[in-house]
């Protein structure tokens, strides 16, 4: 089905539910707007109505209008959803409100992925390090869009502090976005442009994870931070932001949390004191126990079946 651009979101959804059914379930991933989605779904007799939370902030300014909107959407979600899901406890509480986990309708459903795909690969490590001349370097890695949320401005300052203590340090950034040129210019201003690699978007991210020695991710907010889980599956220690990144992300015991407001030198110390990366696959097995895509898919199917009163 497609949505007619001349209709509103509400009109399009109502039209699809009315003319395209019957539907057994509506599973909404549009944050607070899920309040509208599950309300329309209930009005059209959809028996299973799921609201799913994926973040802990949007970086928005909290005006009175915004607070009123979120209050109303929460009311609609609680009144009309049959199940509340989130990628972390923090994400659930951000969208559904504090104390939501006490309700039997609310639970965490991890973002499953093919964990085996992200295992450490010695050949991939050698190839990427050779491609960029990193054979003898201490490689600090980062994977993320060059947008405000990922906080590259502080990342580059933190790496400058690392450079002051590790002459062999190199920063390997995977991703692209609207702030890339600004961050590239900032690296030149800090005098470290020759020690920063902007690799752009890459399809073979496991090889890039394998090329890294530690993972630095000072994000401003995250529902979970999937790249942090991928990096741990690859055997990396991850250094990320205290409070705004959920503690759920520490799957392997290889996550260190630093306050966002801490000076760059504090972040540098966390990176430089991080345990050496693993290469034997133990971390991948630990991650797989929670995030294996097949297991997560089976859990979601079980939720659908339970909500529908059983599957045939």
Positions of PLM-derived features:
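A short, active-site helix/loop in glycosyltransferases that binds the activated sugar's phosphate group
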Residues: 79-119
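A conserved mid-protein helix/loop that constitutes part of the nucleotide-sugar donor-binding site
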Residues: 138, 142-161, 178-184
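A short helix/loop element that forms part of the nucleotide-sugar donor recognition site in Leloir-type
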Residues: 13-14, 119-133
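Short hydrophobic beta-strand element within catalytic cores of glycosyltransferases
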Residues: 228, 237-241, 247
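A charged, aromatic-enriched C-terminal amphipathic alpha-helix characteristic of glycosyltransferases
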Residues: 278-312
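Short His-centered aromatic/hydrophobic patch
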Residues: 28-34, 53
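Aromatic "clamp/platform" in nucleotide-sugar-dependent glycosyltransferases that forms part
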Residues: 201, 220
